[in-house]
Amino acid sequence: MPLSLGAEMWGPAAWLLLLLLLASFTGQRLAGELETSDLVTVVLGQDAKLPCFYRGDPGEQVEHVAWARVDAGEGGRELALLNSKYGLHVSSAYEGRVEQPPPPRNPLDGAVLLRNAVHADEGEYECRVSTFPAGSFQARLRLRVLVPPLPSLNPGPPLEEGQGLTLAASCTAEGSPAPSVTWDTEVKGTASHRSFTHSRSAAVTSEFHLVPSRSMNGQPLTCVVSHPGLLQDQRITHILQVAFLAEASVRGLEDRKLWQVGREGAMLKCLSEGQPPPSYNWTRLDGPLPSGVRAEGDTLGFPTLTPEHSGTYVCRVSNALSSRDSQVVVDVLDPEDAPGKQVDLVSASVVVVGVIAALLFCLLVVVVVLMSRYHRRKAQQMTQKYEEELTLTRENSIRRLHSHHSDPRNQPEESVGLRAEGHPDSLKDNSSCSVMSEEPEGRSYSTLTTVREIETQTELPSPGPGRAEEEEDRDEGIKQAMNHFVQENGTLRAKPTGNGIYINGRGHLV
């Protein structure tokens, strides 16, 4: 009776409590496991889903799921309780922020949604699941709340051409975790970084320094911020403004035909550039601007030109940084004195000198060629004449010799005949012989010597082998004849005798 009464007093809750106590005392899990994530990441302001799914044997039931925040060093704070019979119960601290996932729902799924996550929600959470009849299970996860940065770009001080290294801009971004800040630009410069860490976030500041120049004016300087909480990098662009003023120059005098008396539409234009944009002012050195001349910004327009418009005009370019001047001399000419009709003496002189130099060079070449041809022709003529005279002299000498050899009796007493070597009537001597004639029309020594040379150069037939005996007799006759002559000063003279002529049967010797 008491036992039955006690059994009737125990309800399902008592039996469940008993099973939990038995499971806790034994320290063993009967069956099943919890599936969750070690880390859940959510961007600030978005909903975070805290997963907790019980995977057990068929027939097991999840009675209730309890969520609590269990940060290190702090006690557990109840978040919510899900009961299979009574539904969801949320603690007052998270009222309106914790919900169940939208249907359909699995009875074994104990996940909850944390709406509109804030950075304070970052921490560690525990899921405790009570099942029947397996008992209770628990698992932990960490919630990470990403705080995307909101970058800001601050321009540096005004940039001026000629400055040294100057701050162009700084870019700051704060988030959790610390963001990455870089620069995207074609401008040459250097970047420096500084970071500051707070309790729940970190700030990064990057500065970009450069040396200003006019080429940088108008160039983009972009700050690029990267962060895990951003779907794509954030970019902030700053356009550089570098103050400068370029040199001034005046154009309009290139076509001199426009600057003649009576012409219209003549104008001068002042060229310059700067930042900020410059202003233009036209003046005239030798007085005020002539009447009718109008200045409109960088342009100075002239009416119908007259000689009074001649003068020196000055264009002054100014901006907040500096000012520049440029001047030109305007000379309005009469049509008769237009540059197109004037003779450029310098150019003409250069052309004349060039033409004269070319003509002289050509003349020099012609003279050299003609002189060369003349000397060549002269040399040929002299050579030909010399050969003709030499041939004629040889022919005369040979003809004379032939006439003497053909008839010795016809030779005049005044002449002296010299025979070539090898002739039976000649005198043979290794030295040159000279014969002086005593007749009034006798020949000189030089003439006889020349004849001797010519005769010697004349080729005569050499004696053959059959005339050897004649050669010996001739030599003997010469030896006998030499007994009657004496040699003085290179001349043969007859020895004093009663008869000055020696007659040999083989020939006549003088």
From Swiss-Prot:
Compartments, as annotated in UniProt: Cell membrane; Cell junction, Adherens junction
Bilayer topology term: Single-pass type I membrane protein
Main location: membrane
SUPFAM superfamilies in alphabetical order: Immunoglobulin
Annotated Gene Ontology cellular component terms: adherens junction; plasma membrane
Translocase recorded as keyword: no
Gene3D superfamilies referenced in this protein's UniProt entry, alphabetically: Immunoglobulins
Domain (Ig-like C2-type) ranges: 148-237, 248-331
Keyword field: Cell adhesion, Cell junction, Cell membrane, Disulfide bond, Glycoprotein, Immunoglobulin domain, Membrane, Repeat, Signal, Transmembrane, Transmembrane helix
One Gene Ontology biological process: symbiont entry into host cell
Glycosylation sites noted in the Swiss-Prot or TrEMBL record: N281
Signal sequence residues: 1-31
Positions of the Ig-like V-type domain: 32-144
Biased composition (Basic and acidic residues): 400-412
Extracellular face of the membrane: 32-349
Cystine pairs: C52-C127, C171-C223, C270-C315
Residues covered by region (Disordered): 400-475
Parts of the chain that traverse the membrane: 350-370
Cytoplasmic side: 371-510
Its job: Seems to be involved in cell adhesion through trans-homophilic and -heterophilic interactions, the latter including specifically interactions with NECTIN1. Plays a role in the senescence-associated cell size enlargement via SFK/PI3K/Rac1 and thus promotes senescent cell survival. Also participates in the innate immune response by acting as a ligand for the receptor TIGIT to inhibit NK-cell activity.
Family: Belongs to the nectin family.
Complex formation: Self-associates. Interacts via its Ig-like V-type domain with NECTIN1 Ig-like V-type domain. Interacts via its C-terminus with AFDN. Interacts with TIGIT.
Record-given protein name: Nectin-4
Gene: NECTIN4
